[in-house]
């Protein structure tokens, strides 16, 4: 925890000096990642917690309950990364995976937070981008009506 806290402190000081916003992202629970939920982030951040900004990536949360918990209890969320996931792959197109956006979209939309759509698209045809745009238009933002 000490090394990570010192690294966070240094990054935050550098960002402040440059007047550049910075946020820390809670990562997916895979072997190499350490900060995988809000409790670990708060513990590691320690005295930095009260002025720290966070990016919430819904694909990194183990289930919808964790997304809602983090959305409602994390202070100072700067933005939301939206993508889906399967049991074996993170950051799949929004309509392809285990994430129930029908359950999440009312809370996400009510938050008023900026939404970032996963930008990973290996082909020049922009298939993932097109799938995400279609899903957002036909399914996700439909909750607003």
State what each model feature region is.
Residues 1-53:
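Active-site acidic/histidine proton-transfer and metal-coordination neighborhood
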């Amino acid at each position: 925890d000490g090394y990570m806290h010192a690294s966070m402190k240094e990054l935050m000081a550098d960002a402040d000096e440059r007047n550049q916003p910075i946020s820390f992202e809670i990562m997916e629970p895979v072997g190499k990642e350490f900060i995988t939920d809000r409790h670990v982030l708060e513990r590691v951040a320690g005295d930095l917690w009260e002025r720290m900004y966070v990016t919430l990536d819904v694909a990194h949360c183990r289930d919808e309950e964790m997304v809602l918990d983090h959305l409602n209890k994390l202070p100072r969320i700067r933005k939301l990364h939206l993508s889906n996931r399967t049991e074996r792959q993170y950051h799949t197109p929004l309509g392809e995976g285990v994430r129930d956006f029908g359950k999440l979209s009312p809370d996400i939309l009510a938050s008023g937070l900026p939404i970032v759509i996963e930008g990973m698209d290996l082909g020049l045809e922009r298939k993932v981008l097109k799938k995400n745009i279609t899903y957002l238009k036909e399914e996700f933002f439909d909750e607003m009506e």
